[in-house]
């Protein structure tokens, strides 16, 4: 798992050297700026049938670094045409990358963001996918 942040809050040069091995680059940008408590500005919709996020449909991700990808990576979460998260399969393993640490920060537990955001459910979906990568393949 590769969790980065937006360009103002993370190191990119060395991290991208690792990510490039998997066909992933974290862009030096910051997407989904949110003003105050206007949480809807940080909303990302998840389509049914998503490879990883099988139950979550709407998550809150603000100020993330977008991704650029090439083989073997594939996008697994987009905001319009912008890639938010990707997966790369290498040999018997898999790498998940996302441009924000939204699975383990203050937006995860449902106390700060409105209930319609399903960040906790998305984190559960990711954990189930990770376990399947170990046990189910």
Region locations from a protein language model:
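Second-shell loop/turn segments in exported
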Residues: 1-8, 111-116
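Short, well-ordered beta-to-alpha junction loops that form the rim of enzyme active sites
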Residues: 80, 99-101
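Structural recognition of the beta-strand scaffold that forms the well-ordered cores
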Residues: 1-3, 77, 95-97
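Noncatalytic linker/hinge segments flanking ATPase motor cores
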Residues: 40-49, 98, 128, 136-137
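Extracellular ligand-binding/catalytic regions of CAZymes and related secreted enzymes
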Residues: 25, 90-93, 101-137
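An acidic, glycine-rich "communication" segment
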Residues: 5-90
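A broadly tuned preference for mixed-charge, low-complexity surface segments
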Residues: 1, 55-59, 126, 136-137
């Amino acid at each position: 798992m590769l969790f980065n942040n937006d360009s103002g809050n993370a190191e990119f040069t060395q991290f991208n050297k690792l990510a490039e091995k998997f066909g992933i680059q974290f862009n030096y940008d910051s997407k989904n700026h949110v003003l105050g408590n206007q949480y809807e500005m940080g909303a990302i919709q998840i389509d049914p049938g998503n490879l990883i996020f099988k139950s979550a449909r709407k998550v809150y991700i603000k100020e993330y670094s977008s991704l650029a990808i090439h083989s073997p990576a594939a996008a697994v979460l987009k905001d319009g045409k912008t890639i938010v998260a990707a997966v790369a399969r290498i040999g018997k393993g898999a790498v998940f990358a996302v441009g924000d640490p939204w699975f383990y920060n203050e937006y995860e537990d449902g106390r700060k963001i409105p209930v319609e955001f399903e960040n906790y459910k998305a984190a559960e979906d990711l954990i189930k996918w990770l376990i399947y990568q170990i046990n189910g393949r």
